[in-house]
């Protein structure tokens, strides 16, 4: 039986919110908050993969297992691929990528992503989404949108408003029932993770800055379904960070 592991990619030099992995949330750095949240799961291991000696030292201070990776990776998935290779995980094992900026991620969503990959044998990656309920979120590039087919395989991910509802402008009320926000959690089989790192970064991946597009561009399937539980988007801005801080300080 395949083992299931959680790997948290943690890059220090984030673009939109520098050093966010170490941002204080109610007395603890964000990376610790994320780690403590995922320890509520029952998977085989939890690893932090980072390019930063500073993050490594802090993570080891709260007894996390850490793998130090190169600092030139194109994406978190590339970083995880290096980590699982170093750790010697079996090809049939499953790895769940939990973003290092989601300290409130529901455990139910992590479990659902892993189970979806087990259930969808044609997919090499699985992920989650949720219905958009605020029209403003459709036009926010920090909220990645996704469209998928009738069999729940992703067709495309974009920072733009997809699907495009012809005949409406951004200022008009549109039917938001067909808009879904992608939740940045992924489950992969280790064999595909190793292959992913060998694939060339695709033009659409560069254009959208979305690592999952490398999978679709190369003809592989991503299984997707709605999340088990609603969650906040990842912390990308100072405003996002303040929202999370308020929730921890309640």
Curated annotation (Swiss-Prot):
Pathway: Nucleotide-sugar biosynthesis; CMP-3-deoxy-D-manno-octulosonate biosynthesis; CMP-3-deoxy-D-manno-octulosonate from 3-deoxy-D-manno-octulosonate and CTP: step 1/1; Bacterial outer membrane biogenesis; lipopolysaccharide biosynthesis. GO terms for cellular component: cytosol. GO terms for biological process: CMP-keto-3-deoxy-D-manno-octulosonic acid biosynthetic process; lipopolysaccharide biosynthetic process. CDD domains: CMP-KDO-Synthetase. Gene3D superfamilies: Spore Coat Polysaccharide Biosynthesis Protein SpsA, Chain A. SUPFAM superfamilies: Nucleotide-diphospho-sugar transferases (SSF53448). It is found in: Cytoplasm. It is an enzyme of class 2 (transferase). Its EC number is 2.7.7.38. GO terms for molecular function: 3-deoxy-manno-octulosonate cytidylyltransferase activity. Keywords: Cytoplasm, Lipopolysaccharide biosynthesis, Nucleotidyltransferase, Transferase. It catalyses: 3-deoxy-alpha-D-manno-oct-2-ulosonate + CTP = CMP-3-deoxy-beta-D-manno-octulosonate + diphosphate. HAMAP family: KdsB. Activates KDO (a required 8-carbon sugar) for incorporation into bacterial lipopolysaccharide in Gram-negative bacteria. Belongs to the KdsB family. This is 3-deoxy-manno-octulosonate cytidylyltransferase. It comes from Francisella tularensis subsp. mediasiatica (strain FSC147). The lineage of its organism: Bacteria, Pseudomonadati, Pseudomonadota, Gammaproteobacteria, Thiotrichales.
């Amino acid at each position: 039986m395949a083992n299931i592991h959680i790997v948290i990619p943690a890059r220090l030099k984030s673009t939109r919110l520098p050093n966010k992995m170490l941002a204080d949330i109610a007395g603890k750095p964000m990376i610790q908050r994320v780690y403590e949240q995922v320890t509520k799961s029952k998977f085989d291991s939890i690893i932090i993969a980072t390019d930063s000696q500073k993050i490594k030292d802090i993570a080891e201070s709260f007894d996390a297992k850490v793998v130090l990776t190169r600092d030139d990776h194109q994406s978190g998935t590339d970083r995880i691929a290096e980590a699982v290779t170093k750790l010697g995980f079996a090809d049939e094992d499953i790895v769940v990528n939990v973003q290092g900026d989601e300290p409130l991620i529901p455990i139910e969503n992590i479990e659902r992503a892993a189970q979806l990959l087990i259930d969808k044998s044609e997919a090499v990656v699985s992920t989650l989404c949720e219905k958009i309920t605020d029209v403003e979120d459709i036009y926010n590039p920090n909220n990645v949108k996704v469209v998928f087919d009738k069999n729940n395989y992703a067709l495309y991910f974009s920072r733009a408003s997809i699907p495009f509802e012809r005949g409406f402008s951004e200022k008009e009320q549109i039917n938001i029932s067909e808009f879904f926000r992608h939740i940045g959690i992924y489950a992969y089989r280790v064999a595909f993770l190793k292959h992913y790192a060998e694939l060339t970064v695709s033009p659409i991946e560069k254009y959208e800055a979305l690592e999952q597009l490398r999978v679709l561009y190369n003809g592989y399937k991503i299984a997707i379904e709605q999340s088990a539980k609603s969650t906040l988007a990842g912390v990308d801005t100072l405003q996002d960070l303040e929202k999370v801080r308020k929730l921890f300080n309640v």
